[in-house]
Amino acid sequence: MRNDYLVNDSTGKDTLTQAILELIEKSRSNIKIANFFFQYKGVVDAISRALDRGVAVFVLSNIRLNRYGEKSTKAELQNDTTLFNLTELSYSGAHIGLLNDLHAKFLIADSKEAIVGSANFKAASLKYKSESGLRIIGGDIRALEYVFETLYCNADIKSFSSSSGRHALITQTSVTSINKAMLENSRMRFTIVASNSYRNADYHSNLPKDKEAGVISIFQSILKVVETAKEYIYIVNWQFKALEDLSELFDALKRAIHRGVQIALVSSVGDAKAINQKAVDKLIKIGCKHYGHKNNHAKFALNEHSGLLFSANIDGESGLLTGFEVGCMLSQSERSEAVRHFQNLVGECEQTKDRQ
């Protein structure tokens, strides 16, 4: 039986990576793909082969022009090959759109099958980090495809390559509007809100500025998981940050603890340790258990009867409240697989000592 909950882990299990590559390889008509990075050679090469067999490829990414601008270092530009790879794909016929607030990670093939998840297209994410993903078929794809097409048409930057070999990044200004009716009766969840950075003169975002932009948000769905829990809450993420800007979530977690719900958290103590520490200490203080994992980048939230998987960090500054992120509610079988994933992660961790 095919498992639609997909995992990469530090033991070498790579069902998510293999599912991504297989979905690109079997595409025949079109691919719509969004990711924060396009560095992993296996994915880039698979997209190139799809272009060679006549598949129409549409890409949404974020080359972080706000980060790699005048102050960028040579090392930063050399280490992040995303712009180079997207330029090469554009030369080969891919249609490239760039969003300054994109952090979502998903792939749609032939409007029939999709994968959403936590993994960036980087070697670390696709080879040894713990990552979570979900294979999607059926009606939910329509909502995901609608959002992709809307944001692609209103991308902050379009990438153009001419037959003469010239390449250009063209900024465009438009107003993105989301039709809520297109997302109803779907398991898909989103964040689609311009970050506060758009207020800076040198930052541009075509995403809606309104936090009530017509989507069922990832944040509200996480809150519902917390508020409806009676036995336990498991939250797995790369980082916990800026909880002062997530007061609704923090207060909901406190109320859950007061009604006897057991709360366990997993986050990275590798590349995100310094970012995590302040927020983790606050969560431990109110009664949460925290497990630090060296290589975790998986992202999901569960209770005993519901859950969702998503691309966003638990970060009050970016992701849950602003930016472009994608998530999906879990079926009961998928939730059970996510519980097993959580248990495996905890088995690889050492519980953080109580710092009260």
Predicted regions and their residues:
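Charged, low-complexity intrinsically disordered terminal segments
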Residues: 1-95, 101-102, 108-356
